[in-house]
């Protein structure tokens, strides 16, 4: 396998005209049918990658509470229709190697003027440019020689149609002829959805399409909450050009539709401060029978814009407001009379309210037809006319202060208090960049009779004087200024000017910027007369600790509440006296003859039979579909599998198996922000070790009665006082003294319990403080090969003597058993679950792969070190015939790249380990792939499928296992609700039962896909997982095979004694990829502290990093759990 790091050429050059950059993809040395020399070029405009990315056709990004666009997500750069500008073009070059499409996501790393080429990346480019540490443009020793640039005189670029590209010519797996819902398998039921049918006009309506670019203060903007109001304001100012505004539809970003064609095909409005540029695109027919796939995909944006246009119009007073892709309800009453148990507005701290918003995703490719998928979200808004005095009380109390509490407790206290510097700092953070209002009719002050008057919020017609917050000043009775030559305090001024005697003159003044004629001075206003503005505005500023958790708790609807509210919205009923967000009776819907059904779509569903779980001494069958069982808390505790306590040996090994015995050590890690020593709860440690022993895994004890487990070593570490070498010495001592405890026929497995005084993520990244957790994981798991388990000091302190009363003990036991490779359970083979018996047939074994890529957070991309800015691709695969024990391998790759750069090596490792442990080649390879949207399917399926086929043929030309490729995603908005709540459990919040399968109506008509709900819990409404079976060559299996096998895999996650939302291989891939990212940070910290230079342009350094980020090969078990 060779790499090419040159600026453009050689073998496998791929040109991506999105950024006019050359990408070198000589990953697989694959020769196409065109004499082995065809490559391809794809200029589709793939937006910046977001690790929350879902299937939204507007930008290819997903936000759970942030989408109103279609979920078709083809994202092929049709800017001429739904993004503005551009088009779709594909080219290919004559080249010796196949070049795979590479997304060039530029997060501002500035690795050179052409994106920067690195050995971990497919992006080529010229060396140069600023910012990034890693540059490109040169070829490292041992890598492919640079060749001629693709598209040069000797290698001209020829246009080729999209359908001619090999990855677009492949066919997807076909849905089975008979669906499970039509078979006798499982229990049948009917569910409600959050979809409703959409009917287009029977006679097509002619619409004219325009691209729009809105400029605010000379800068182009694409923020919905800004562009929408400005667009309509400009439109009204230019009636001679545009006529009446009600003839236009605007998507609040960049597209406008009109029934009338403008006299000018393009132009610009003449307001210098705010204007927009329009350009005519084309004429379309809206309605009738539309069968063209491309038109159907683009149609969703228009339907969404028409349906929500009325709600998105700026009104005074506002009824709805737009933020990103949700339309938020601005209502005075928190409840709708028809929904007395569903709150539309929740009061939170610091004068904020969490208001509900509605999003609509138009789906045009479903089996039911065109549908509108409604969803809900919440965000923070300022409370109308909320006095700053009350804000100060919220800050002091850390909760919402009610009127009664204010009058009884805070009124007298505030008159005598001095505001602390910390509270002033927090208040300044909250108010920064906020628009406030000053009004003598608002705030808390004393009336003429001396009684405390809490004025109601002023009306919209008398909102007070608005101003921009600058800062906080001295108290009103000590803030002096000169007026007409007389020195006054602010308190004296308001007494003389407005006859207001301040009740709290001791509180700080609020400052605003004074008019220019007053110089650079500030105007000061008493805190008690200042409030938030009357109109609720979205709040995006500083939030108090735990406010996020508080908001989630208060805004989480139960399944029944969410279902009722969505059905109310779909029925187009008013909410708290405000018109529904979508209505067939509004003028825009009538004009375009668009109709939405007023009832949700009902779907058939099947509750699949569960598998049977096998423990060492017992079995469990979830016959009532509860999705939860007892293991550690079972009486007696369920034992690990027979033989699981012995060290796993290779198939060909003749060594006698040794029994594993755990021996613990304690590492106390202090927070660098605290100086106090801390003592850990030794009884908690011993209780955990006792629970591990009771589950069947032997532990080394200090006494015969097994009351006290051996503590091999103990260390207290503080990064401000000790160097990393102290931890290294501690780990070395553990390894060197293991022999003192070993017995015949046994092997000591050391494990370090790291007790953290505070979460490392709280303090890492500030004041040169690093993440202790990441450093420890790198040193222990990877460098020295010692198991670790982290726990917070406060959590260890509450561990009880019995795991029956302590959920934390149960979790710790399951995690430790998984990490050290002691298998606690497996799924029964040969029982009633026939498809699982086929899946785990020893004669035709199955290798299951889970694939995921962990990307850097926004903070890491902006401020992280060079390794923190990279992505980590991980592949996990089972090493046993029961598909229970998994191992992982990871590779570093460029930021935001979703395709696996070095997938061939990952496949080699996973197949190799499977063969080493089972002695058999897999007859079937099943891939569960996460992180893809529908627009990615063709490309990534082709690349990864071909790679697997090639690696198998390289092992042996006769080695041709079946390959199944399944994409897994929860990034969608579809939800299901019980039509009859009595079919659910109160303990599960009346959600659909785990194991519920949906195959029809809201699934696609293009792919073999299905929804499967397997998660359990008692809060919120669970979102089902969407599965796409894109490729499947496994023959001779029943039609119900993949839904039932996938369901069974959700019982196989070793950390939990409940079913989980995703199959175990996918969750393991998530965890392993996350651990790899954390390890990269640990590696960087270790190298920085030890002054070890790492250059990712160096092939040797890159290989070293890839080796260091993987777990020590001598360490057995699923360390990533």
UniProtKB/Swiss-Prot annotation:
Per UniProt, which keywords does this protein have? Cytoplasm, Repressor, RNA-mediated gene silencing, Translation regulation
List, alphabetically, the SMART domains matched.
PAZ (SM00949), Piwi (SM00950)
Q: What is its main location?
A: cytoplasm
Enumerate the residue ranges of region (Disordered).
1-134
| All copies of domain PAZ, residue ranges | 426-534
Write one Pfam family the protein is assigned to: Piwi
Q: Report biased composition (Polar residues) as residue ranges.
A: 99-112
Where does the record place Gly residues bias?
1-14, 125-134
The residue ranges of the Piwi domain are: 774-1081
Question: Any idea which GO molecular function terms this record carries?
Answer: DEAD/H-box RNA helicase binding; miRNA binding; RNA endonuclease activity; single-stranded RNA binding; siRNA binding
Organism domain of life: Eukaryota
Expression across tissues = Highly expressed in the germline in hermaphrodites.
Q: Which GO terms describe its biological process?
A: regulation of translation; regulatory ncRNA-mediated post-transcriptional gene silencing; siRNA processing
Basic and acidic residues bias locations: 15-29, 40-77
Q: Where does it reside?
A: Cytoplasm
Return the GO cellular component terms, semicolon-separated: cytoplasm; cytoplasmic ribonucleoprotein granule; nucleus; RISC complex
Q: Describe its assembly.
A: Interacts with rde-12. Interacts with rde-10.
Function as written in the Swiss-Prot or TrEMBL entry = Argonaute protein required for gene silencing in the endogenous RNA interference (RNAi) pathway. Involved in the 26G RNAi pathway and associates with both unmethylated and methylated 26G small interfering RNAs (26G-siRNAs), which are a class of 26 nucleotide siRNAs that possess a guanine residue at the 5'-end. Associated 26G-siRNAs are methylated by the methyltransferase henn-1, which stabilizes the siRNAs. Association with 26G-siRNAs is required for the biogenesis of secondary 22G-siRNAs (a class of 22 nucleotide siRNAs that possess a triphosphorylated guanine residue at the 5'-end).
Family that this chain belongs to: Belongs to the argonaute family. Piwi subfamily.
Specify the protein name.
Piwi-like protein ergo-1
Q: Record the organism.
A: Caenorhabditis elegans
This protein's encoding gene: ergo-1
